[in-house]
UniProtKB/Swiss-Prot annotation:
Its EC number is 3.6.4.-. This is Protein CHROMATIN REMODELING 19. The gene is ETL1. Residues 114-135 have a biased composition (Acidic residues). It comes from Arabidopsis thaliana. One of its GO terms (molecular function) is hydrolase activity. Induction by the mutagens rose Bengal (RB) and methyl methane sulfonate (MMS) is enhanced in progeny of Chernobyl plants exposed to ionizing radiation thus leading to a higher resistance to DNA damages.
Length: 763
């Protein structure tokens, strides 16, 4: 049964049968009486205006997907709608003679998509890379490619340019000097809502919470409301990390209900680590909303109930559904069933937090999520790092945001989107301005505490240096056999001769030693391993069904620290025995921490320590125990339900000095303003990952200056990684801020590691 949104009574909303414990029921504020007929939101500014008198352009197409606007001079009172195809797809000279077409903001909507549109076979098609009908271009509709592959980028930007020009007029009026940056905070003239409107929409009668937005956040909300008013189906809120994108997005959803009679349903997709925070902020800023967190053990029961409701044509029992990205990554039957349920709902807004997770349009995550989001009224992406490595990744976000414009089907964008093309970078930046709101802390928060960057170059301890040199000699010898087969012994030849897996293994070993020598096996010899394995085998350390030979093989693959843990765990007495506290200080970085942390604690600072390796976090726990400071830990293995508790405990309990976090799990979305110091123990090739980690404490609510320490072990691959990371940040600044030319060959990590290894092993 198909019903318009306004046909659903408040009584039906309150009498649904869904009583899951995670649903937050709030009394709904009375809606204002809606006009009998809602006029279509004004989109006349998108029509091409001729200087001549009224003129009608007819079309023979029967495609009713889009509508054309007939311009009647400068009058806004008479707008004629005729059926036709999207004339933006014509060549540029023909576009100049026609009208710009935009899809109007949808007012009347259906809750449920017909079963024919979301059949049980859809998800199987989504899992197939050959299913271009399911994903190809992400529901590109009538805006397919025209011309040769090399023209696809220009065609997409040409279609986008007309819309961009009119949006720019709305944002900036006749102001000049704003065309070379993304949407600015001071220059925007849009005033759809004020702080008083925010107070009315977000204030709950039984709460003393004051929903105050900062001025730039109010601009962000108005920006999103303008795009909704104009029927723009996608946007990227790309404010720098720590500027409150979550609050702006949540306030926007509240205002859609208050001002546009659109209470959802909305789908919010985010990393697992911030699910609890999203639910908490939704409760605070959207007191009239019902929120369901679709995650955890009870998800299967929710799935069955939601499936039943959607098939019956009933309205959803929530305003906002919170899900994790993992729901779109895995291929179990449960995940497939979940995605089928989501595809049956007609979403108003699909909101993606940390949307740079969608940088690869060929990934299952991108394709599966697009199969759900393609029918939504709007796709809103939140990311503080819209450009991480190259223009191809940015284009993937744009295609997800506005698939009708940016669909590229099977075109190899990596060949077309060259970072050396200065003209393309400048053109993209100018055209995309009105669709991407990007503010930096330096632009909008001069009062924000400063962030001080420090690089600590540390010298290897003697035994650490010996281990590093031994590894060089070992891998150099192993590479000689391959070099003999080459006619040229150049650096490039060595890089090409080594298989990718071997390059990765060698490079990882060098990184481990640079971090801590206990991450390799050097203390426990093969004889020690055999003796230890014979003691572990009878007590079933690896299972009683495991043979002695298999135990020996397994332990030989362990590093020194892991063997130490085994001996400690099972209380095995051996000649070598467990390691002592002095072994934890065999690393230059741990020795540096032992010098820095006590003085930081004495000065009243609190610290976040990030590492990419959970095994390194284990060693860092040992290090902090030896130093004698209190800490908490959060990594990928931490239960989702426990993460927010750890964050709250650290922020509120000042007796806890440090928090250990894995860079990937702990570097996204968390608010850890209880700390004022960040230590990046080991850097990522992608500098944006480390920047996300930095901004866990350098964000709104921080009252102390923030200091960032990067630990770099001298004369190791650490220095190479640091230099590469600095170069990659240039491209982000080029496209998102200044538009200057950059030289980036788009090398893969494997190629980069190969070149570093070649230089190291041939040195």
């Amino acid at each position: 049964m198909k019903r318009d949104f306004d046909e659903i009574s408040e009584e039906e909303w309150s009498q649904h049968s869904f009583n899951a414990s995670r649903v937050l029921k709030r009394p709904r504020t009375p809606k204002k009486t809606r006009a009998a007929t809602n006029p279509t939101p004004s989109i006349e500014s998108f029509a091409f205006r001729r200087p001549s008198t009224a003129m009608t352009i007819e079309s023979n197409s029967s495609d009713g997907d889009c509508v054309e606007i007939e311009d009647l001079g400068d009058s806004d009172s008479d707008v004629k709608i005729v059926n036709g195809e999207d004339l933006l797809l014509e060549d540029e000279e023909e576009v100049e003679e026609t009208k710009v077409v935009m899809r109007a903001a949808r007012v009347g909507r259906r809750f449920v998509i017909e079963d024919e549109e979301a059949s049980d076979d859809d998800d199987d098609e989504a899992e197939s890379s050959a299913s271009e009908d399911e994903f190809g271009g992400g529901g590109g509709g009538s805006g397919g490619r025209r011309g040769e592959d090399e023209d696809v980028v220009g065609k997409a930007l040409q279609k986008c340019a007309k819309i961009s020009a009119d949006l720019r007029k709305e944002l900036y009026g006749t102001s000049s000097g704003v065309t070379d940056r993304y949407s600015e905070v001071e220059t925007s003239t849009v005033r759809i809502v004020t702080q008083n409107d925010i107070d009315d929409a977000c204030k709950a009668e039984d709460s003393d919470f004051q929903p105050i937005l900062k001025p730039y956040q109010l601009v962000g909300v108005n920006f999103l409301l303008l795009l909704y008013k104009k029927g723009i189906e996608g946007a990227i809120l790309a404010d720098e990390m720590g500027l409150g994108k979550t609050i702006q997005a949540i306030t926007y959803l509240t205002l859609l209900s208050r001002l546009n009679n659109d209470p959802g349903p909305h789908l919010v997709v985010c990393p697992a680590s911030v699910l609890e925070n999203w639910e908490r902020e939704l409760r605070k800023w959207c007191p009239s909303f019902t929120v369901l967190q679709y995650h955890g053990a009870a998800r299967a029961a929710y799935s069955r109930e939601l499936n039943s409701l959607s098939k019956a044509g009933k309205p959803p029992p929530f305003n906002v559904l919170l899900v994790c990205y993992s729901l779109f990554e895995r291929h179990s039957e449960q995940q497939k069933d979940d995605r089928k349920v989501l595809k049956r709902w007609r979403w108003s807004c699909v909101l993606m937090d940390e949307a740079h997770a969608l940088k690869d349009k060929n990934s299952y995550r991108w394709k599966n999520l697009m199969s759900v989001a393609r029918n939504a009224n709007q796709r809103l992406m939140l990311t503080g790092t819209p450009l991480q490595n190259d223009l191809h990744e940015l284009w993937s976000l744009l295609e997800f945001m506005l698939p009708d414009i940016f669909t590229t089907e099977n075109v190899d964008l990596k060949k077309l989107l060259n970072a050396e093309d200065t003209e393309l970078i400048t053109r993209m930046k100018s055209i995309l301005g009105p669709f991407i709101l990007r503010r930096l802390k330096s632009d909008v928060m001069q009062q924000l505490v400063p962030k001080i960057q420090r690089v600590e170059y540390v010298l290897m301890e003697r035994k650490q240096e010996d281990a590093y040199k031994e590894a060089i000699e070992e891998y150099r010898a192993a590479s000689q056999a391959r070099l003999v087969k080459l006619s040229s012994k150049s650096l490039n030849s060595l890089a090409k001769a080594l298989p990718k897996r071997q390059i990765s293994n060698y490079f990882t070993q060098f990184r481990k030693i640079a971090n801590h020598p206990l991450l390799i096996r050097r203390i426990y010899s093969d004889e020690d391993v055999i003796r230890i394995a014979r003691k572990l085998h009878p007590i079933g350390a690896f299972g009683f069904e495991c043979s002695l030979d298999r135990v020996i093989e397994e332990v030989k693959g362990f590093n020194d620290f892991r063997i130490h843990q085994l001996l400690f765990q099972y209380g095995v007495n051996d000649t070598k025995g467990t390691l002592s506290d002095k072994h934890v200080m065999l690393s230059a970085k741990c020795r540096t921490l032992a010098e820095l942390l006590p003085s930081m604690k004495k000065s009243g600072h609190r610290v976040l320590i990030f590492s990419q390796w959970t095994s390194m976090l284990d060693i860092l726990e040992w290090t902090l125990d030896v130093i004698g400071v209190t800490y908490r830990r959060l990594d990928g293995s931490t239960q989702v339900t426990d993460r927010q508790t750890i964050v709250d405990t650290f922020n509120n309990d000042k007796s806890i000095f440090a928090c250990l976090l894995s860079t990937r799990a702990g570097g996204q979305g968390l608010n850890l303003t209880g700390a004022d110091t960040v230590i990046i123990h080991d850097m990522d090739f992608n500098p944006q990952i480390d920047r996300q980690a930095e901004d866990r404490c350098h964000r709104i609510g921080q009252t102390k200056p923030v200091t960032i320490f990067r630990l770099v072990t001298k004369s190791t691959v650490d220095e190479n990684i640091y230099e590469i990371a600095k170069r990659k940040l240039v491209l982000d600044a080029a496209v998102l801020e200044s538009g200057v030319h950059v030289d980036d060959n788009g090398d893969t990590p494997e190629k980069t590691m190969g070149e570093i290894l070649a230089s190291l092993l041939m040195g």
